[in-house]
Amino acid sequence: VDLDRYAGRWYEIASIPNRFQRHCLGNTVASYRPVEEQRIEVINSCLDKDGSLDTAQGIARIVDTGSNAKLEVSFVSLFGWHLFWGDYWVLELADDYSYVIVGTPNYRYGWILSRTPELSTEIRQYLDERLRASGYDPAVFVETPQGLQ
């Protein structure tokens, strides 16, 4: 994974429901920016149930420097020290960096992200095949609405 190419804005197309996003109605976006060697700033945002924009800022660190495809992310810091790291594995990445499947080794979490708010039916079907090949059940992924007001 080329971190400079991976940087930027990603729209959440679908995800496995999880406790830390349960307040999100949609418009979920992740933004990544390299900040130092082996570290990436992460800013996630979504439309909250109360109509406000909810934002979470964290940091990702590379744990597999050979591929840059295995990272850990933390959104909890205490006195500048990040705590509670979670796995963030790039399982499938388009050659042109237009879409990505992110998951965890225990299959508990998963996301389909895209550079655009929507994916074609053909690409989505392909990604469902890639999810199966990675050990995921595509049926547990819930579509994320984009463009909500």
Predicted regions and their residues:
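A beta-rich soluble binding module of mature secreted/lumenal proteins
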Residues: 1-149
